[in-house]
């Protein structure tokens, strides 16, 4: 299978390099990843600037742009072969609940929504690289299981979160997104006209069946996410009112 790998932490980050090593054992790997960290960059496209692309080795591109830029340019211009699937990660840090709105990891995967297989975003619930090899092996195992599952609609993105563990985790559950509370307020830097964005809110909707609950119980969470943001229930009520 031909896989395009991307991320938001940058090409030289430990997470994507671990995933390259693991998935290249069985698959043909192409890489298009940002030059710099673009965490929380969401689905931004750089439409107001020229974007520099460096071909650092065969089928590996380092792009001075956003995660979405990377996958968009790779699929529409750089890579002539037919790519089967986009996999984004391994992100160092969780993408649970509302995090997916801001996530550059999820956004990179989302750019692969028109391919044969559902795009996949993978995150490790820690910024510590100690257990990254276990996470990469778990990612490879889950990837193979997903590809074998013919019931997954290719118009769905799969958001995977892997608990941090000293052991290789293979147990996984399909979950729904939880929900975070109000984020920590932005903070002004003393005596300067600069501000820092506050931390994400604590989980509020974290009951059984959510990604929060599942990962807290040391089980890998796989959340199917649809691209259609329409609230169909409200739409139906409005049309019938």
Where are these regions (language model features)?
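A cross-family phosphate/adenosyl-ligand binding-site feature
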Residues: 3, 17-77, 81-82
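Short, glycine-rich nucleotide/cofactor-binding loops
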Residues: 5-12, 99-100
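Hydrophobic/aromatic beta-strand patches that form the interior of the parallel beta-sheet core
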Residues: 30-32, 61, 118-122, 158-160, ...
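Short, Asp-centered acidic motifs that coordinate Mg2+ and/or phosphate
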Residues: 85
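Glycine/threonine-rich flexible loop motifs
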Residues: 94-103
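Hydrophobic/aromatic ligand-binding patch that stacks against planar heteroaromatic rings
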Residues: 108-112
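Glycine-rich phosphate/pyrophosphate-binding loops
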Residues: 113-134
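Electrostatically charged, flexible surface regions
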Residues: 134-241
